[in-house]
Amino acid sequence: MKPMTSDVMPAAERKVRVDLAERSYDILIGPGLIAAAGGEIASRLKGRKMAVITDENVAPRYLEPLMASLAGSGMDPVSLILPAGEKTKSFEHLIPVCEAVLGARIERNDAVIALGGGVIGDLTGFAAGIVRRGSRFIQIPTSLLAQVDSSVGGKTGINSPHGKNLIGVFHQPDLVLADTAALDTLSPREFRAGYAEVVKYGLIDKPDFFEWLEQNWQAVFAGGPARIEAIAVSCQAKADVVAADERENGLRALLNLGHTFGHALEAATGYDSKRLVHGEGVAIGMVLAHEFSARMNIASPDDARRVEMHLKTVGLPTRMADIPGMLPPADRLLEAIAQDKKVKGGKFTFILTRGIGQSFIADDVPSSEVLSFLEERIPR
């Protein structure tokens, strides 16, 4: 794999810069960043009032050290603890978050802090984006998925019965603190789910990185330098795409590899994390995207098999049959896909591939082909 372009910092930390002119920000990666958060924030923001939003799973481990770090740096923090899980990304919980931010009297130089995984980051970022027409926002992601994907790039939002992430705004954070020590407390399933997003970056346009993951995934799972390297490469990859296409007018859509199928499967399971979590849906979706590309004679079936083999080796689901319980029929899944992506003249936009690391945007995929493909793969 080619060397990373992100800066090397003391104590095995990495720094990745998201270049968005006056809205540029740093992603700091390494152990101990939650305890050091107060100093990092104080060096960047003038405000002293902080509203910390977290969930009931993360709070017992990390809320107290974060609050102590903020207070120790002269800040006045308040906190709100929400239920954990995908169903928290809803209007029901958005309103209390907004009220908590207003109640904390957060002003222009103060900040809202998301302490948790992707759900907390997306929800909190949305609240920060709409309260006072935009408040400063800091991401402290505690899951692998959030560290390499959802905390970077400014996409925020909540789910709807019509589909995932359909209500939201673009609102960039002022800082991302990815404390890699927090990943040591994740369940194996949570870590694997986040790893699917790491693999995605190799499959989009970094075949050398995918090959490196095939050879080094065990070291990534074990922790240490390989894990930090994988996170830093992933963050740099996303930062480069976001800098080139912040509002997803073109290139950024490539980051949706596996997500069109994956989001439809999440909706089909009612966002029930016992059946399917986001990263698992992405894993299945990436295999489906490669298989569909092969079906359309765009890619080799060998590439789809290689992707499936790696994801299966690390313990991720790769087939719709791996999802517990019944799935709806193909036409219902197609309806969910239609909500997730724009349909023009009966044709879908998908991220397809010509091979490992050769993904591209296809905006003329016939819905009839997708329906036929799904009918073949839904377990009977």
Swiss-Prot record:
Cofactor: Co(2+); Zn(2+); NAD(+)
Key words, A-Z: Amino-acid biosynthesis, Aromatic amino acid biosynthesis, Cobalt, Cytoplasm, Lyase, Metal-binding, NAD, Nucleotide-binding, Zinc
Source superkingdom: Bacteria
Subcellular localization, as worded in the UniProt entry: Cytoplasm
GO BP, sorted A to Z: amino acid biosynthetic process; aromatic amino acid family biosynthetic process; chorismate biosynthetic process
Binding sites annotated in the UniProt record for Zn(2+): 197, 259, 278
UniProt-listed InterPro entries: Dehydroquinate_synthase, DHQ_synth_AroB, DHQ_synth_fam, DHQS/DOIS_N, DHQS_C
Catalyzed reaction equations: 7-phospho-2-dehydro-3-deoxy-D-arabino-heptonate = 3-dehydroquinate + phosphate
Known EC number: 4.2.3.4
Note on cofactor: Binds 1 divalent metal cation per subunit. Can use either Co(2+) or Zn(2+).
Broad class of enzyme this protein falls into: lyase
GO annotations of cellular component type: cytoplasm
Coiled-coil ranges per UniProt: none
Gene Ontology molecular function terms on file: 3-dehydroquinate synthase activity; metal ion binding; nucleotide binding
Binding site for NAD(+): 118-122, 142-143, 155, 164
Main location: cytoplasm
Pfam families to which the protein is assigned, alphabetical: DHQ_synthase, DHQS_C
Pathway assigned in UniProt: Metabolic intermediate biosynthesis; chorismate biosynthesis; chorismate from D-erythrose 4-phosphate and phosphoenolpyruvate: step 2/7
Function recorded in the entry: Catalyzes the conversion of 3-deoxy-D-arabino-heptulosonate 7-phosphate (DAHP) to dehydroquinate (DHQ).
Stated family: Belongs to the sugar phosphate cyclases superfamily. Dehydroquinate synthase family.
This protein's name: 3-dehydroquinate synthase
Organism per entry: Sinorhizobium medicae (strain WSM419)
GN (gene name): aroB
